[in-house]
Amino acid sequence: MSETINTASQFPTFEKPTVQFNEKGWGPCELPDTFKDVPYQPFSKNDRLGKICDWTSTSNNDKKYQNKYASTFGTGNQYSYYHEEDETTFHLVDTARVQKPPHQRGRFRNMRNSRSGRGRNARGGINTHGMTTLSGKNVKARDPRRGMGKKFGNRGPPPKMRESSVAVRADWASIEEMDFPRLIKLSLPNIKEGVDIVTCGTLEYYDKTYDRINVKNEKPLQKIDRIVHTVTTTDDPVIRRLSKTIGNVFATDAILATIMCSTRSNYSWDIVIEKVGEKIFMDKRDHTEFDLLTVNETSVEPPTDDDSSCNSPRNLAIEATFINHNFSQQVLKTGDQEAKFKFQESNPFISEDEDIQVASVGYRYKKWELGSDIVLVARCEHDGVLQTPSGEPQFMSIKALNEWDSKLANGVEWRQKLDTQRGAVLANELRNNACKLAKWTVQAVLAGSDQLKLGYVSRINPRDHSRHVILGTQQFKPHEFATQINLSMDNAWGILRCIIDLVMKQKDGKYLIMKDPNKPIIRLYDIPDNTFDSDDSDDGEGDDGEGFQQVYNYANNGNKI
């Protein structure tokens, strides 16, 4: 053949690739030049497509399942983004966590559970459609805490049901119910200071060395063996004598203070009222806890109801009364050689031939014009007298605040705060004992005391309620202190006048006003004339029977007084 065919020009040539041979193992020996400086990150073919930004996924607030579908790959920092610092866009952000008040904590808990599929009628939650409605009794049995603590997000124990100071009998007729919102709005202004009618008793002078007592220089509280008379209105011989000529409403300062400060009370109390013609006599029942001082009555967490404990309401009331009587006598200059201030008449509750040690007390029988021909006559008391540089005596009302256990009482440590932050200690006492302090202030104002002396007495050991020490004293002017604690005397007189007017409209007989133990209500009852008489004790009622129970006992099995 004359013509030669060249196949090389028609078809491409095949070049054999370079195959690296790894003598020591499997795989390439060197990294190809085309893949140099390229970052590598492990990956998985099972990763979801919407991993970077998935707008279709539902937000899960439970951190337990936050990374349930997260991939174990892609955790390296090869593809991490680093933002360069730019001072022009710098802003301060407040990241402090705002503490919510207790009543707002957990208020959206049920709403959040509903959105996450765990609420009622939601997927995964409780289906209430088609459920049989239970009766009222079964609902309470199923959920005994239902309805408790609604204001605070169902937090805390259910409120304790207090017992009434007196058991309401079937033959008592309810006349009127006065709720606290109505009583708070009452006002009787322009009541002048009371006028002295009779003054009795003997007062001892105050020892000024007790003003220098502080936490570092404390003084033990002594046990003073003196008799303190707490005579009711109708048993007072002076009031019996005055009722024939002066006044038409008769009471004691303790009874008046209880009525005037009724809107601040939480515990139950009662006062017996007798209407004879156009005259009204207000009495306290015998053998009751009316004269005992309450402890932490207005506290958010009142004392426990364990009668065997020294911190039960009744035991704390006895302890507070014991402290108050001893403190009011210890701070005075005692002894036969010490000077004393004597009123016009002697103590009306002891005879001249009796040789007994009586507490220092001065009685003022005063009258007030309340309008509409209502003249109030009341017995008021002073605890001591102070000698001023000018020689004029200043009468004092001496009271004592006591610390029992600051941890249980939600209080402040007196030994840590009393010298440096006495205002904080007093503010805490005003929260926990608002009613007691208001009563003391009203009694001092009614008596016309120039000073209200407050003592701070604490236990030596929180578990020992028999030994106490004085940590300090503080004095106030009664009218100024009433302004500080937001106590309106116009409102106090208005409450008293309201009750007097209600009783004046009734027929002659015996009545009883009682504070409801669990509601802010005062009730007026028409009771039989022989109620609470000593003749009823044979029938198991009256003063020693089922006519009343303990004022501060929450249990039903409390001992009768």
Swiss-Prot record:
It is found in: Cytoplasm. GO terms for molecular function: mRNA cap binding; translation initiation factor activity. GO terms for cellular component: eukaryotic 43S preinitiation complex; eukaryotic 48S preinitiation complex; eukaryotic translation initiation factor 3 complex; nucleus. GO terms for biological process: cap-dependent translational initiation; formation of cytoplasmic translation initiation complex; regulation of translational initiation. InterPro entries: eIF3d. Keywords: Cytoplasm, Initiation factor, Phosphoprotein, Protein biosynthesis, RNA-binding. Residues 98-164 are annotated as: Disordered. It holds the Pfam family eIF-3_zeta. Residues 100-121 have a biased composition (Basic residues). Residues 289-303 are annotated as: RNA gate. Its main location: cytoplasm. The modification Phosphothreonine is found at residue 128. The RNA gate region regulates mRNA cap recognition to prevent promiscuous mRNA-binding before assembly of eif3d into the full eukaryotic translation initiation factor 3 (eIF-3) complex. Belongs to the eIF-3 subunit D family. mRNA cap-binding component of the eukaryotic translation initiation factor 3 (eIF-3) complex, which is involved in protein synthesis of a specialized repertoire of mRNAs and, together with other initiation factors, stimulates binding of mRNA and methionyl-tRNAi to the 40S ribosome. The eIF-3 complex specifically targets and initiates translation of a subset of mRNAs involved in cell proliferation. In the eIF-3 complex, eif3d specifically recognizes and binds the 7-methylguanosine cap of a subset of mRNAs. This is Eukaryotic translation initiation factor 3 subunit D-1. It comes from Drosophila ananassae (Fruit fly). The lineage of its organism: Eukaryota, Metazoa, Ecdysozoa, Arthropoda, Hexapoda. The gene is eIF3d1.
